[in-house]
Structure formats: structure tokens, C-alpha cells
């Protein structure tokens, strides 16, 4: 392990605290490999370098015997690399930067044209020409930067900018776009919640109107509160589960929900029939049945679209058939009217009555105004629960 040293050695022998098994690879140019001799002087400017033979001296080290590098080497030229441990505190900052005397503000950065003039010499044309070089193009387009193929310049600056951002990172998001993108769904959600709360009040309002018919001129009250189990006074529309009238209240609410669902289905059916999405064949003259099919050989050609079903044909006679085109709108309504008129002959009189009312339009309008004036408040109280459904119906009517 080597005898302890009584005196400090100079040079590499002094470095006894830094073990380095690779000390026999010195990092200066005195190696004969660099042909350093008297004719070729040393160009290593390290003032603390040792003579070459002293690099072979053995140092104790922290992990046993080993070769200690000459000056610096893999450890650098610092005092710690030389084996000199310095424990003195660092020098205080000069007075100009001392906090006691006040620090000067950071100077304003000079403009880009002064610090990086080479960056101001580029324009889009020069940049496109530089992209023709495969080595430069490979920095922005790794998939197309090979030197074996010729690449065309980027046609637009926008596409070039997007490619550079995809390489260096996404740009900062525009908060205005984020706000406008979130504002729309929030308003829709608020409108949906408002309509939902209003729609949920429809059954309760209709239930109140239904029960009020049983208490004409008398304040409504639940008959179940006079049973054997006394319950506090309450309305028949807010019976607790322990009240005998609770089951009747649930039954009324269920019937009201079915009525609302039927009303929505009727509205949807009318809307589809108006748009011509119900290609129902009308009743053929002189018959109570219909036969829908393509027109092949018809005595009367069908006018309009040729898509199937395009016409209504009677039973063929002698290979020919009578064809009637399907109406493009209100086909189902016309079918229902023809079907009802064939079974109830008195309905045909309503057509003349409607035509007569249309001919007397001022009288009809005055009659309608008088009816609204007389029965308007009662109609409003009855139809007010259905007002929240009006925007939904209007939206469906406009969208389909």
C-alpha cells in the first residue's frame, strides 16, 4: 500500500486524495506520440504541469494504490483536480453589485438586428431555396429530408409555419377562441336545464288543472286526509306516500305523461308528413285498397319523381294499370281524409263549410278575435304548461 509520507511531495505526488486508475493516460502534449521535444516545444500552457517521469509515481488515493494523473487530465485543471483542497470562502462581490449599495437594473436587450444580424437576412424566398438542400430540409421534414430525392419548396408560408411548430412545439393557444368555444355549449346547457325544469312542471300544472275540475267553487283538498290515519291538510297534487290519495296522484301523472308523449309523436308525424317523408299512397278511385309499386305500363303516367314508390297502381287489366302519383307533401293527411270521407259521408260537408269560411274571411277573423277575448284567460291558464314545448317544436320544425 506504500509507506506514509512525512513531507508533502510536489507535483503529482502531492495529489493523495483523488484516486484515478487511468492516471497513466495524461492529458498534455508531452507524450512522445505528439512529438514534443526540444525541436518541437511544448504547447501545453498549463503552468501546474509536471514532468513526464513524475506521472508514474504511485499515490495512495482514497481507494487504494493507483496511478495519479498529472495535471488535470480527466478531472480538469481545478485545484480540486490537482489534489489541493481549498476551504476558503469565495470572494465577496464587488461594490458595484453589492446589495448594500444597490443593484443596477438590468439593461434593455438590444434589438435583434444588432445581436443577430444573420437572422434578419433571411426572407421567404431564401428560406424556400435553402429547403432544397436535403440536409436543411431534414431539420424540418424528417420524413422527406433524404439526399437521394429532390424536394420541392414549400408553397406557402402558412404550411411552413405549421411544420416548424410541429417540430419545435405548439404555439400558445388563443384564449379568445377557447372562450368562444366554451360559451356556446354552456349557453346550450343552461337553456336545456331551464327547459327541463319547466317541462317537469307540466305534469304538476296539468294535475292541478285536472283536480280543480272536481272542486268547482270549492278549495281543493285531498280526500285521503279524512281517513283513519289522520294526515295534515295538503293539496291533492302533493300527497305524501302515506296518503291514500298518493296512488291516484301517480296514476294521473302517468296519464299526463302518456298524453304529452302522444302529443310529441303527433307533432313529429305531422312534421314528417309536411316534409314528404311519408310516401303513403292515396286511395284509388272506386276502391278501398291501395297498391304501391313501380310504374311499368300505365294508362295514366305518374308525374313527379321516379323513385320507388313513385305511383299507386290499380290491378292490371290486359297488362295495363292506372297509376296515381304520390303527393310530395301531406300524403298521409290526404290518405286519412280520403279514408274518413269514404266511411263518413257527412265529412264532405265540412269542405264546403271551410270554403265558405275562407270566403268570409273578415267575419271569421272577427269571430276568432271575439273567442280569444272571451275565453283567452282560461285558454292561457290551460295552455301555459305547454309553452316550454313551443321552442322545441319550432326547432324541430326548422331543422327537418
From Swiss-Prot:
Keywords associated with the record: Acetylation, Caveolin-mediated endocytosis of virus by host, Fusion of virus membrane with host endosomal membrane, Fusion of virus membrane with host membrane, Glycoprotein, Host-virus interaction, Lipoprotein, Membrane, Myristate, Transmembrane, Transmembrane helix, Viral attachment to host cell, Viral envelope protein, Viral penetration into host cytoplasm, Virion, Virus endocytosis by host, Virus entry into host cell
Glycosylation sites per record: 320
Subcellular locations according to the entry: Virion membrane
GO BP terms, alphabetized: caveolin-mediated endocytosis of virus by host cell; fusion of virus membrane with host endosome membrane; virion attachment to host cell
InterPro entries: HBV_HBSAG
Biotechnology note: Systematic vaccination of individuals at risk of exposure to the virus has been the main method of controlling the morbidity and mortality associated with hepatitis B. The first hepatitis B vaccine was manufactured by the purification and inactivation of HBsAg obtained from the plasma of chronic hepatitis B virus carriers. The vaccine is now produced by recombinant DNA techniques and expression of the S isoform in yeast cells. The pre-S region do not seem to induce strong enough antigenic response.
Ranges of biased composition (kind: Polar residues): 79-88
Segments for region (Disordered): 70-115
Region listing for Pre-S, in residue ranges: 2-174
KW Lipoprotein (keyword) present: yes
Region called Pre-S2, residue ranges: 120-174
Topological domain spans for side Virion surface: 2-181, 275-348, 399-400
Membrane spanning residue stretches: 182-202, 254-274, 349-369, 376-398
Residue ranges of the region described as Pre-S1: 2-119
PTM remark: Isoform M is N-terminally acetylated by host at a ratio of 90%, and N-glycosylated by host at the pre-S2 region.
Lipid-conjugated positions (N-myristoyl glycine): 2
Intravirion side: 2-253, 203-253, 370-375
Pfam families: vMSA
Record function comment: The large envelope protein exists in two topological conformations, one which is termed 'external' or Le-HBsAg and the other 'internal' or Li-HBsAg. In its external conformation the protein attaches the virus to cell receptors and thereby initiating infection. This interaction determines the species specificity and liver tropism. This attachment induces virion internalization predominantly through caveolin-mediated endocytosis. The large envelope protein also assures fusion between virion membrane and endosomal membrane. The middle envelope protein plays an important role in the budding of the virion. It is involved in the induction of budding in a nucleocapsid independent way. In this process the majority of envelope proteins bud to form subviral lipoprotein particles of 22 nm of diameter that do not contain a nucleocapsid.
Similarity-based family: Belongs to the orthohepadnavirus major surface antigen family.
Domain statement: The large envelope protein is synthesized with the pre-S region at the cytosolic side of the endoplasmic reticulum and, hence will be within the virion after budding. Therefore the pre-S region is not N-glycosylated. Later a post-translational translocation of N-terminal pre-S and TM1 domains occur in about 50% of proteins at the virion surface. These molecules change their topology by an unknown mechanism, resulting in exposure of pre-S region at virion surface.
Name listed for the protein in its UniProt record: Large envelope protein
Protein source organism: Hepatitis B virus genotype H subtype adw4 (isolate Nicaragua/1853Nic/1997) (HBV-H)
Amino acid at each position: 500500500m506504500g509507506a506514509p509520507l512525512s513531507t508533502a511531495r510536489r507535483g503529482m505526488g502531492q495529489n493523495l486524495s483523488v484516486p484515478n486508475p487511468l492516471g497513466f493516460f495524461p492529458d498534455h502534449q508531452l507524450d512522445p506520440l505528439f512529438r514534443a521535444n526540444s525541436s518541437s516545444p511544448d504547447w501545453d500552457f498549463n503552468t501546474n504541469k509536471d514532468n513526464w517521469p513524475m506521472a508514474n509515481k504511485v499515490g495512495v488515493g482514497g481507494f487504494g494504490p493507483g496511478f495519479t494523473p498529472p495535471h488535470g487530465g480527466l478531472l480538469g485543471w481545478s485545484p480540486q483536480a490537482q489534489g489541493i483542497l481549498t476551504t476558503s470562502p469565495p470572494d465577496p462581490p464587488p461594490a458595484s453589485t453589492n446589495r448594500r449599495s444597490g443593484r443596477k437594473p438590468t439593461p434593455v436587450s438590444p434589438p435583434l438586428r444588432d445581436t443577430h444580424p444573420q437572422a434578419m437576412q433571411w426572407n421567404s424566398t431564401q428560406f424556400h431555396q435553402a429547403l432544397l438542400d436535403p440536409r436543411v430540409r431534414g431539420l424540418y421534414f424528417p420524413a422527406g429530408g433524404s439526399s437521394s430525392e429532390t424536394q420541392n419548396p414549400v408553397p406557402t408560408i402558412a404550411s411552413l409555419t405549421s411544420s416548424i411548430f410541429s417540430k419545435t412545439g405548439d404555439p400558445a393557444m388563443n384564449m379568445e377562441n377557447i372562450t368562444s368555444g366554451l360559451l356556446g355549449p354552456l349557453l346550450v346547457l343552461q337553456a336545456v336545464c331551464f327547459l327541463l325544469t319547466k317541462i317537469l312542471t307540466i305534469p304538476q300544472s296539468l294535475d292541478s288543472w285536472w283536480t280543480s275540475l272536481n272542486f268547482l267553487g270549492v278549495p281543493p283538498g285531498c280526500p285521503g286526509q279524512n281517513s283513519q290515519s289522520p294526515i295534515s291538510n295538503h293539496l291533492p297534487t302533493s300527497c305524501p306516500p302515506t296518503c291514500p290519495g298518493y296512488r291516484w296522484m301517480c296514476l294521473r301523472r302517468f296519464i299526463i305523461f302518456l298524453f304529452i308523449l302522444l302529443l310529441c309523436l303527433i307533432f313529429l308525424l305531422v312534421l314528417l308528413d309536411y316534409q314528404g317523408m311519408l310516401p303513403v299512397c292515396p286511395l284509388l278511385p272506386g276502391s278501398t285498397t291501395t297498391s304501391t309499386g313501380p310504374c311499368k305500363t300505365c294508362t295514366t303516367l305518374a308525374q313527379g319523381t321516379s323513385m320507388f314508390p313513385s305511383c299507386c297502381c290499380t290491378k292490371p287489366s290486359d297488362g295495363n294499370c292506372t297509376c296515381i302519383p304520390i303527393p310530395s307533401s301531406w300524403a298521409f293527411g290526404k290518405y286519412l281524409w280520403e279514408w274518413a270521407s269514404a266511411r263518413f259521408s257527412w265529412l264532405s260537408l265540412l269542405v264546403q263549410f271551410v270554403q265558405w269560411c275562407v270566403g268570409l274571411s273578415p267575419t271569421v277573423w272577427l269571430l276568432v278575435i271575439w273567442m280569444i277575448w272571451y275565453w283567452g284567460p282560461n285558454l292561457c291558464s290551460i295552455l301555459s304548461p305547454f309553452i316550454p314545448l313551443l321552442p322545441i317544436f319550432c326547432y324541430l320544425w326548422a331543422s327537418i
